[in-house]
C-alpha cells in the first residue's frame, strides 16, 4: 500500500511544473476525448494503479454551479480506466450538507459513472490514520486522514473554479479540506477554521500531496463563493502535475494575482511552483482564456 508522507521541497530544487489548459464551452462536449487526450500529454503511468478522484462536492446543487460537474468526474474516471488503472475510486467528505448520499443524488453523479458501490468513499466516515505534520503552519501538530487517501497510488484533486469569501479562491489546494473527516474535525470542518484556514490548507497539502489536478472551469463561481456566489462561465478545463502551479495558473485565468493570496505565496516556497516562469504552459495560453472573476470586497487587492 502506498503511504503518503508530509514533504517539503525547496522551490529552487524542483523541475518546472506543467499545466495544460483546454477550451471547453459546454459539458455536452466529448469530455472523455478531451480529458483522455489531455492526460496523455502528461505521459502518466497508470497500469494496475489505484486512483482516487477527489471532486468538490459541497452541497445540494442541482444547477451544477457549486460542485465539480458529474460529467467531468465520470469522463475522468473512464479515462483513467482506459489508461490501465486497476481501480478508480471517487471520494469526498462534504463539509456543509452532511448527507453525502443526498448530494450524490442532487448532482446526478451516478448518471455519469454508473453504479459505484464500494468505488465511492465518504471520507467523512472512512477509517483514519495519524499523520504527523512537518509543516506545522497551523496550530495542528497532526492530522487524522482517511486510509483511502493515504493508500491511493495516484491522488487527483478535482476542484471547481471558484472564489472564496474567506480564502480568496478555492481550487486544488483548498479542495483538500474535503479529505479531512468531519467525524474527527466537525462541520463545516470547524477545527481547521479555528486553526487558521490558510495555514491548515498548507498542512493538509503537505501531508497528503495530490499527484495531479483537474480543475472544472467550464462553469465556475464568482463573488461570494464557495456556496452563495454567482455562476461564471470560464469555458476551460485545466490540468496540472503540481497543485501550486495549477492553482496559480487558475488564479491567472480568473484575473487574480496568486502571489497576493497568502497561503499560495507560502506554498510556492515549499510545495510547488508559483511563478509563471517556472510553469511550462501547455494548450491554450492564459491570455486567450482569461475571464475576470468578481471577488468580495476583502479580496479586491487580488485583481490584476
PLM segments and residue spans:
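N-terminal and secondary-structure boundary signal
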Residues: 1-304
Amino acid at each position: 500500500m502506498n503511504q503518503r508522507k508530509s514533504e517539503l521541497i525547496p522551490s529552487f530544487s524542483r523541475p518546472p511544473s506543467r499545466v495544460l489548459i483546454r477550451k471547453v464551452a459546454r459539458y455536452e462536449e466529448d469530455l472523455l476525448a478531451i480529458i483522455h487526450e489531455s492526460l496523455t500529454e502528461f505521459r502518466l503511468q497508470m497500469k494496475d494503479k489505484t486512483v482516487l478522484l477527489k471532486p468538490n462536492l459541497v452541497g445540494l446543487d442541482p444547477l451544477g454551479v457549486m460542485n465539480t460537474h458529474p460529467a467531468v468526474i465520470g469522463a475522468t474516471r473512464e479515462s483513467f480506466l482506459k489508461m490501465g488503472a486497476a481501480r478508480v475510486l471517487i471520494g469526498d467528505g462534504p463539509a456543509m450538507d452532511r448527507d453525502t448520499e443526498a448530494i450524490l443524488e442532487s448532482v446526478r453523479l451516478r448518471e455519469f459513472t454508473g453504479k459505484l458501490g464500494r468505488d465511492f468513499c465518504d471520507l467523512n466516515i472512512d477509517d483514519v490514520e495519524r499523520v504527523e505534520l512537518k509543516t506545522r503552519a497551523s496550530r495542528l501538530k497532526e492530522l487524522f486522514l482517511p486510509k483511502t487517501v493515504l493508500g491511493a497510488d495516484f491522488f487527483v484533486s478535482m476542484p471547481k473554479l471558484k472564489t472564496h469569501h474567506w480564502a480568496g479562491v478555492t481550487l486544488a489546494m483548498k479542495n483538500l479540506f474535503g479529505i479531512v473527516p468531519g467525524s474527527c474535525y466537525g462541520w463545516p470542518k470547524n477545527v481547521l477554521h479555528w486553526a487558521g484556514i490558510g495555514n491548515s490548507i498548507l498542512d493538509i497539502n503537505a501531508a497528503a500531496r495530490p499527484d495531479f489536478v483537474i480543475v472544472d472551469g467550464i462553469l465556475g463561481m464568482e463573488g461570494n463563493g464557495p456556496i452563495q456566489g454567482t455562476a461564471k462561465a470560464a469555458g476551460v478545463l485545466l490540468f496540472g502535475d503540481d497543485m501550486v502551479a495549477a492553482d496559480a495558473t487558475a488564479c491567472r485565468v480568473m484575473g487574480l494575482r496568486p502571489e497576493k493570496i497568502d497561503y499560495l505565496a507560502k506554498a510556492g516556497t515549499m510545495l510547488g511552483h508559483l511563478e509563471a516562469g517556472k510553469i511550462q504552459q501547455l494548450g491554450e495560453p492564459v491570455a486567450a482564456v482569461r475571464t475576470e472573476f468578481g471577488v468580495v470586497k476583502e479580496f479586491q487587492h487580488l485583481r490584476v
